[in-house]
UniProtKB/Swiss-Prot annotation:
Source organism per UniProt: Postia placenta (strain ATCC 44394 / Madison 698-R)
Domain notes: The conserved DDXXD and NSE/DTE motifs are important for the catalytic activity, presumably through binding to Mg(2+).
Record function comment: Terpene cyclase that catalyzes the cyclization of farnesyl diphosphate (FPP) to a single major sesquiterpene scaffold whose chemical structure is still unknown.
Binding site for Mg(2+) 1: D88
PANTHER family documented for this protein: BETA-PINACENE SYNTHASE-RELATED, TERPENE SYNTHASE
Listed name of the protein: Sesquiterpene synthase 9
Top enzyme category: lyase
């Protein structure tokens, strides 16, 4: 019997029952104007592509991810999202050699934010330099160190992803999570929540902190991959996506893979909330910072889901409708992705 290709997919409502509400930083509009003007002034894309890039509203992502940060710190968050997604557009089509060169440039800029960049260098160097030269001024020393370390881990994983792409490698589910926990960029993003904090190293080493971070990272992966799969599969670029990974590993169809995503998401949700409600105490001053950080982790889940539907990146102008109806037509012809995905 010939199995026909489905024409629609159902998107599970993974936000159902999540106790953290969608919240937007009060400095969103002001920061959006400043950050978009800044990235546009560096000309990472031509005018047409830059317009599409701005339509994705990465400042909204930052403003929902960091709703309680100060004006200076939310600007750092917005600029980080610009760096992330410009790098993503460049590296998604890069060879291993080119990806490694980009990584070396960006890391040199982050380690030496006051050093002028060579005029003939990839623009990523100047973007990273200006981002961190401004951001490090208002970051605590521990948070700055942790951010740079985590960002290096993210960059190295992108080279690993390029290697997979060159060799047409489809990972096992476990192998996929090993690299995806890095390529999703969650850890450096979490580090920005610490910009004004001074949480001792012994606290970071507590298992509860790691469990919460991993649970949220995995939920972000599941939601991001579930919501971006349709666009990615339409251009044959879904090898680095949990939906495709599960379909291959379990020899199943997209509907069953989506159900797998939903079930695992529910397990992660319960695990996170159990740990969140039983975090150890380290004294009033540290506890207040830990609570703020843990709340920020929980907020990242709803932030990621909300932005995915509200921006133009994955669903164009149809995001709000699709979020309500949960059904989307499977794309069956090549489309442009990333900043060129929609005409919104």
């Amino acid at each position: 019997m010939v199995r026909t290709r489905p024409t629609y997919i159902y998107l599970p409502d993974t936000a159902a029952g999540w106790p953290f509400p969608r919240t937007v930083n009060p400095y969103y509009e002001e920061t959006k104007a400043e950050s978009e003007a800044w990235i546009s002034s560096l000309y990472p894309f031509d005018a047409y592509v830059q317009k599409k890039f701005n339509a994705c509203d990465f400042t909204l992502l930052a403003s929902m991810a960091y709703p309680w940060l100060s004006k200076d710190h939310i600007r750092t968050g917005a600029d980080l999202m610009m760096l992330f997604f410009v790098f993503d557009e460049y590296s998604d089509v890069a060879s291993v050699k080119d990806a490694q060169e980009m990584v070396d440039i960006v890391m040199d800029a982050l380690r030496n934010p006051h050093k002028p960049r060579p005029k003939d260098e990839n623009i990523l160097g100047e973007i990273a330099k200006q981002f961190w030269e401004r951001g490090v001024k208002t970051a605590s020393a521990p948070s700055a160190r942790r951010f740079v370390d985590y960002f290096e881990g993210y960059l190295k994983s992108v080279v690993e992803q390029a290697q997979d792409r060159e060799h047409n490698r489809i990972r096992s589910i476990a192998e996929y999570f090993d690299v995806r926990r890095l390529t999703v960029g969650a850890r450096p993003s979490y580090a920005l929540m610490e910009l004004g904090m001074n949480i001792p190293d012994e606290v970071w080493e507590d298992p509860a902190m790691e469990i919460m971070a991993v649970c949220v990272t995995d939920m972000i992966i599941l939601d991001n991959d579930m919501l971006s799969w349709n666009v990615e599969q339409s251009r044959g670029d879904d090898a680095h996506n949990i939906v495709r990974i599960v379909m291959e590993a379990n020899k199943t169809d997209v509907a069953s893979a989506m159900k797998w995503v939903e079930d695992y998401h529910n397990l992660l949700k319960k695990t996170f909330l159990d740990v969140y409600n039983s975090v150890p105490s380290w004294g009033p001053e540290v506890d207040a910072q830990v609570q703020e950080y843990a709340r920020g982790l929980g907020n990242w889940v709803i932030c990621n889901i909300s932005w995915s539907f509200e921006s133009a990146r994955y669903f164009g102008k149809e995001g709000r409708r699709i979020r309500e109806e949960r059904v989307v037509a499977i794309l069956d012809k090549p489309v442009l992705v990333g900043v060129l995905e929609s005409d919104a």
